[in-house]
């Protein structure tokens, strides 16, 4: 299944609504990842030795992913970015299971951020966008390994 224009519109419309609070939403997203899988904290080089009190909202890497779409206004990812993401994920030792953790955290975070917009169609749109991105990153991980 491809990413349809309707799905792209749902993702972009919900992102428009969330981007004004993207830093706070990014913080909630990362905290949700660590709630689901505490060991995931070790995947982030800037968090490895940080203890329990991590000021994620002040760290640019924590919010970088959530703000890229705001800056570009586009859901497409450049090939060079995918290569970098693949290499970074291989270096960090990211396993397939973590992609599901991130997907769950992403969907939970979006649902909480835009409850008035949330619907089965929006969930499906974000799932499709994430699944395509995750598949592309995994493909680049295979090449980088």
UniProtKB/Swiss-Prot annotation:
Keywords for the protein's UniProt record, in alphabetical order: Cytoplasm, Heme, Iron, Metal-binding, Nucleus, Oxidoreductase, Oxygen transport, Transport
Cellular component GO terms, alphabetical: cytoplasm; nucleus
Motif (Homodimerization): 35-39, 96-108
GO MF annotation list: heme binding; metal ion binding; oxidoreductase activity; oxygen binding; oxygen carrier activity
Pfam families: Globin
Record note on quaternary structure: Homodimer.
Family to which the UniProt record says this protein belongs: Belongs to the plant globin family.
Descriptive protein name: Anaerobic nitrite reductase NSHB5
Lineage: Eukaryota, Viridiplantae, Streptophyta, Embryophyta, Tracheophyta
